[in-house]
Structure formats: C-alpha cells, structure tokens
Amino acid sequence: MSRRFRNLLFGSTAGTLVLMLVGLYTAYKGAGLTCEQRWPFCDGWMGLFPANFASFIEWSHRLLAMVVGFVLLYVLYLAWRRQDDRRVKWAVTAAVFLLPSQIILGALTVTEFTALITAAHFVTASLILLCLAVACVWTVDVPPVDRLRTLAIAAGAVVPFHLALDGSVFVVPVSVLIGFYTVSFLLAGALVAGALWAHAHGLGRIRLLFAAGATVTWFDMLVARRKFGLDQALTDVGALIVLLVLVAVVWTLSQRSQAGGLGAIRAD
C-alpha cells in the first residue's frame, strides 16, 4: 500500500471530521436556516455567495462539503486501482455510497429542518466517518497486545474532558460544545481502532468492550445535540460507562498478562 494513498485517506478522514465540526457549529449558531432557506443557492450575489456572516457560515459548510466529497471520490478511485486490501476498498466504497443520501439530507436540513432530518443527517455523517476511520485502521500494522492496554489508558485520560465539555451541568459557549464533539469523535475513533485490533488478536471480550465504549460515546454525542428532549444527564452517565469499560479493558489485559503472558491473552 502506497504512502501517498495512506496519507490521502487519513487526510480525507480528517477533512470529514472537520466538515462535521463545521456543520455542528453551523447548527448551533442557527446559521443552517440562512441563505433564505435555499439549497444549493445562497442569498448573496446571483445566489452563489453569502450576503452576511451568518449565511457565510452555512455557505462555507457547503463549500467544504463539496471539496471533501470530490476528495473522497478520488480516494475511492485510488482504493480500487492502487492498493490490494479488499477491506479498505469496501470500507471506502461504503463511505462514498452514503454520500448521495447525506447530500440529500443536507439539503433537507435547510429546506425542511425537522429534528428527525437533522438527526438522520448526523447519523449518516457519523457512518461515513466510521467507514473512513475503519479504512484508516486497516492501512496500518496491528500493534502488539500490550499497546491495547496503553490505548485504553490514554482513552480513559480523555474521558474527563468528554464529561466536562458536554454542557450538561453548565451552560457553555458554542466553542466549548465544538470542543466536546472534537474530543468525543477522537475518543470514539480510538475505541473503534481498539476493537479492530483486539479482533485481529482474537480477543473477543476486549473487542466487545471497546465496541461498547465507542457506541456509548457516539450516543452521548447524539444526546448532546438536544433534538429529542432527552435528559442531558445521560451524557454524564454515558461518560462514566465508557470510563468503566476502559477500566475493565485495562484490568482484563493486566490479569491475563500476569496469568500467562501473551499466550494467555490470545486465548480468549
């Protein structure tokens, strides 16, 4: 697998994350209903440019989405022409397959704007990011088992930030909420990587723990969007669950390592 393809894949994944963060910022600033609620046109000169700062935010989100979309198409081309790992090919294909529905949902968030549509827009974007993150994990070598414990400890150190920035206890500015999503997506990505690497080592229970942690972290992000009237304290409960999951991962790996070294860890 070429370094160029790997770098482009990682870059497009990072671009997708930035696009999601810009979209969340747009939603929290109420800019999604600017551009006179028109899509794909805006409210400025000839409908191609924004008329004010609020519509500029929405316009920038659309422009970035277009750029990221074209980059992903190029990544898909390279995935099928320049590298041999079929898992990576199909993961990137799945991400690009979801793009048309995501574009349609993005348009509907402007013209319709219901809680269900905006939630579907977030879910689809999350699935695209998940497919790309999985593809990234599959392009790197599987680390040794002891690195999984290090990963769990590092992820556990991030959970307090996930807990503190969610806005469930104090009213926080939009910039802090975007920080919450940044931390949360990175945390979820690390947990997904842990699940895939645990699977590669045959560690079934560790894989399930990592996967559960990633799922709860994502659910916290969905609840934090405040679209369905769910109690914001659920995000705090979720953060504590993730922390307990990571403690269980570290404890299990430590116990197995002490009991019989690497061989015992593999025999899950």
Residue ranges and their predicted role:
Residues 1-268:
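Polytopic transmembrane helical bundles with strong interfacial aromatic enrichment
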